[in-house]
Regions:
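Primarily the internal scaffold of c-type cytochrome electron-transfer domains
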Residues: 1-174
Length: 174
């Protein structure tokens, strides 16, 4: 059978790679890798907190990111399709590799969704986030891409979970 093509990329898929260096994949969910990779002890016995089933890497708990703790946002809720794996260009700073910024959702600018836009296609493929021509959705200021899961409805900003389609009205700001 063929591998399923989906817009529902799981957090587990992201963390398989994004668990080193800045460890954002771990810290977002409230985990911190210990300095001593091979220190599996907790309360005088072996720890069950190993990373991705690797018996040589262990983590400690820390407070999760506010977006995960309060809104249970998934990686794909912020990381849009065009920049899921970066924009494909060379930058001096890795934070420039993705198009979306905090301001795009926390101080959004809304545009009317035009016919045949990528946002309409992505929302259709997603199947959980409602979006139609003429709706108002936020844009990435850096790239001009429409963020289809952040919309203006009845003069209120609404965030939609790409995973569940659940509408979360603002403010859920930090």
């Amino acid at each position: 059978p063929h591998v399923e093509l989906t817009t529902h990329i799981s957090d587990a898929t992201c963390v398989k790679c994004h668990n080193r260096s800045g460890r954002i994949g771990l810290s977002y969910f409230g985990h911190y890798e210990t300095e001593e990779y091979g220190t599996p002890f907790m309360n005088g016995g072996p720890s069950h907190y190993n990373i991705l089933g690797n018996p040589d890497r262990y983590y400690l708990d820390l407070p999760p990111d506010v977006h995960y703790a309060k809104a249970h946002m998934s990686c794909i809720d912020c990381h849009t399709m065009p920049d899921t794996m970066g924009l494909g260009l060379h930058y001096k700073n890795m934070t420039q590799q993705v198009g979306i910024t905090c301001k795009d959702c926390h101080e959004p600018h809304f545009v009317q969704v035009p016919p045949n836009s990528l946002a309409l296609k992505l929302a259709f493929l997603n199947g959980k986030v409602p979006l139609k021509v003429g709706d108002f959705a936020a844009i990435e200021e850096r790239t001009g891409q429409i963020i289809y899961n952040v919309q203006l409805i009845d003069s209120k900003a609404v965030f939609f979970s790409k995973e569940t389609g659940k509408a979360i009205p603002y403010p859920f700001l930090c």
